[in-house]
Every structure is written in structure tokens, then in C-alpha cells.
């Protein structure tokens, strides 16, 4: 799918972004050798994602930005904007159900979202596997099912299940009930499993990849809550087990970010949550620090909340003042949701259609 013509171009050019194809450009030549394959059964999108990540890892002027989407339309818009990958994050997907990211979403619901997104996009799709939904055998099944659904990558973390504890406190000064809630791994009260259980999860994920369909494996640790040594010890063991990339969650500042990259010998992820615990740096700054990728878990969720609320306020105001405001033209909305492709398809198969 082509990127948005009139939008801002993606600032980091990745030579490995192109998908290998046959000379006529209509089908993929399965005889073409895929680069950077790690699974028993090669997968084009996993190969492409891994190649992009390694390219960015080896070039401090590049970084792979993972904008976290939540459904087919938002994912397609991410691709149309020129981003090289789509990330179905647990926080964003849970929000599409009107729920917080606290373990409500099950594996099959994520698989459904993966299939929905893969049908709507052509770039690699990373998917959030959370804790793997149970024992190491559940982790293995999660990775296998995500790969079968079309995911190019999966993230597995070492938080406990249920994922988070929430602490409610009564504020006498404010006179209301408030909860200590933030987002994703920046949530207060989170806890992690033991090293042994964390390693078993990651080993199960790697085994699923090595014994089956190839898939990029990102291992995440939230163990920074127990100190630097604990987090890096886990990250290094994840690396030894054989993951493709590591994500140490909630690194506070540039110094910690640089140290993390220097102490690991594989692609690393950064996580930018506006207003979160991590210093809010530009993608270019993160690339210079040595990160291969950066994720934006709730940028689109925040945009959705604000835009819908603002639009509803505008609609209410218009009810006593005149016609409702035109946000987008009719044809632009139809094109945005895919009607133009439907009309082209109908035309090509020779069916009668009334073009509006």
C-alpha cells in the first residue's frame, strides 16, 4: 500500500523496507531467498521486520518507529502515513473495546485483531503477547497462534498475571477517591515474575519460533522496579536464549538509555509515553543513543479520545447555532474507509455500479 501523498514523509529511509517480489510486481516469488530467517518455516514479513531492525541497529541515523494501533482502519492509516511497521499494542487494543489494559483481552481476541490488521495492511505487524496468557506452554501456543494469524513479530513480557495491582486511596484534602493508575508498564504497583519463570516464558517463545513459523521475538522486562542489575541481568539472559530484540521498560533518562544500549549486544526498543516515566525524546535522539526501534503506545488512543470528545462538543454547539461542521468531505471519508478500492474492484470484474 502506498503512503499518504500529501502528508509528512517518514524521516528515516530503510533500504530493507521493500518486500521481495516477482518481476511483474503482482505476486511474491517464493524462490527468492529471504534474509535473516530464524524460524524453521520462513515468513516474509518476519524476515522483513528483522532486516529493518538490524539495519537500524547498525546505523545510528535510522530507527524503526512502531506506532501502536488498535484495529484495521487505524493500522491502515499508520501505513498510509509512511510508517514501516504497525504495532498492535495491548493498551491500544484494549481501548478499542472500551477497556483498560489490565488483562481483559484474551489471546483469541488479539489473534482476531491481528487477522483484521493483516488484511488491511502490507507492512509487518508486531503484536503484543503480554505475559503469554499463562504457563510457558501457553506462551508457546500464543506465539504459534500469532504467527499463524499473520503477525511478523510478538512481544512477551515478565510481568505477573494478573498483570497489575491497583491501589485506591482516599484523599482527605481532595475529598474524592483516586486511583494510582498510569499506562502500560508505567503503571504503579506492577510486579514481575521470578527470573526462572521469566526465562521459561522467553525460552518457550524462542522454541515456538525455532520449531515452527518464523516470527520476530521482542522480550520485555519490567524488572527495573527492582534495580538496574536485575533488569540488565534479565535482558542479557533473554539475549542469550535467542530473542531478536530486548525492551527494558521505563528507562528514566538519556543516561539510563545509553547505558542500556551499551550493555546489550542486540537491537533494543525504547518506549515513549507522553507524560510517562521515560524522558520524552525525539526518534532521532533515540537513534543516536543506539536504539533500533521506538514504540508510541498511546499516541493514537489519546488522539482518538481528544478528537471524538472535541467533535461531540462541536456537534452539540452547532445544534442551536446552525449546520454541523464539515470535518471531512463525503468523498474523502468514503476513500478513507476503502470505498474507492471496492468501486475499482467492482469495475474490474465488470459488475454494474453507481459511482457517487
Q: What is the predicted function of each stretch?
A:
Residues 25-296, 302-303, 309, 313, ...:
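Alpha/beta enzyme core
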Residues 3-46, 297-356:
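Extended, intrinsically disordered, low-complexity segments
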